[in-house]
């Protein structure tokens, strides 16, 4: 077996990865393609921890003319002229959770770092004037056009996207900072911005009306992340090593990795793309886990779900027009663009006749991790007991012991605090939906039948469960409705034994009072 390189988990600097001989999945053909396309200003949107910062760092080393770092990579054979350019590299990643004054100081400090490099001792006052001065100085001192790289350009704004008043102040600060990039165009060789969202109305993109958004271009669909082909070729030995450690065949290992971390597509024509952060962590630790979610769940997403009153069962399969992806983030009427840009749903299909995209949750890691993060909205807290309860419920349901699973859920709900929204049947429906989704089973709500809608359908590997939920009634009433409406007939051809489940919740105790379970024959 080939000697394996160490994995650059959490390392986002291209030069360090190469000089330390860590694993690098070669993206330099994309670097060459973009820098020789004739354009100057480019923008790329990708989810967090998807390799954007490493890509920016790769551009930096390339434009600094560090040819020795690219030995053996695709660009070594493509690039004939390794010209060194002055590079201004800014990261906005540290500009989160700030007010207006603090953000202005943060930008000032980032500018001061560059001013020190270029010997500017008496900088201007305003951030935009200082950026202009930096570009002019670098251009005049070197006689070469300047490269500007801005990583996570939208980081200062994402946490306040749900706060209209606060967003306006911070947006004006950032707009002022970015505005020189258009006026300085003759002095610029290349401008590259990365982020999660496209703040169309932020005036960054109206000021930079010549910027090329490559986020959904099929030529760049695989520029970040790890494609299926890259996994099976550049990381082939790593897959074999993981298979040995997990006691699986190579094919089983690839299938398991695909189930957990694959499924992303960023264009109508896109290769299968794996989440790089989770994939590298899984390789490094020889264990599949929910690495992307444990690295942080953005609070802005949870707040936006609340703002738009999005139910957990609404997240998932949907259709969208191309224009929907460009909806201004701060003027959204739907949360779909933010869910897509943040990586919680992704492109799963495209119909060229209607020009409609089909989107859905990409993989098991996102599905389970997302619903885990939403669970506190329905049980009022995050608790280790909740995690262990759900794990035990999963084991019971796999054994077709729904009675035991509901007993466990009833006992758990008796220990959690009151939740303000727990006064409607819909609340309990969504709570059950979230819990069963965390168990990684197929679950759907309000499923149509010829005679009505089934509150919830749960499909496991061995059984199909039809749930009818009641509030302040009894389980017998729920079971009566299932029989009266003849819901099971709709699923007779499912190929699985059908189990009817009637559950009643009590608004006073916020818990299950009783349930009935019957096999359909």
Region annotations inferred by a language model:
Residues 177-184, 337-345, 433-437, 481-501:
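Metal-dependent nuclease catalytic cores in nucleic-acid-processing enzymes
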Residues 411-444:
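Acidic-basic catalytic patches of nuclease active cores, encompassing PD-(D/E)XK
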